[in-house]
Amino acid sequence: ETGLADKGIAPYEKAIALRPNEPLLLIGLASCLLSKGAAGGAANQAVNQKAIDHLRAALRLDPLNGPAYLQMSKGYGQLGEIALAQWALAEYYAAGGHPEARRHARRAIEGLPKGSVEYIRTVDILSAIER
């Protein structure tokens, strides 16, 4: 799988150079990078972080893009950032109105720094669910 992901990186980078504001291209590149970064190690930590940066860029362009949050949870999980991975899953499930959003939001809130953007978003998710 990593070999296929490696082959996808360069074409996505070329496409993004032509269309930098295309969320689906950013998500596709991030997905390839996350597959490459799944092997672990210090070098792959940087690859995973780069993937998360692309996903954040995609979400700035399309804040309700569920697949971006799903990929982000994978990236944060690979980095060992479990609370952030749970937050991303809460966002993913909340966007679809799925009841799993509550469980992931509750897990996230325990580990996120109070006052962080992700903490505030998680509180918002829980508030919306409780209504």
Predicted features along the sequence, with ranges:
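Canonical positions in the second alpha-helix
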Residues: 15, 57-58, 91-92, 108
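Structural motif corresponding to the intra-repeat A-B loop/turn of tetratricopeptide repeats
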Residues: 2, 36, 45, 79-80, ...
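Helix-start (N-cap) detector for alpha-helical repeat units in TPR-like alpha-solenoids
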Residues: 23-24, 66-67, 83, 99, ...
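Terminal, low-structured helical/coil segments at or just beyond the last alpha-helical repeat
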Residues: 78, 94-131
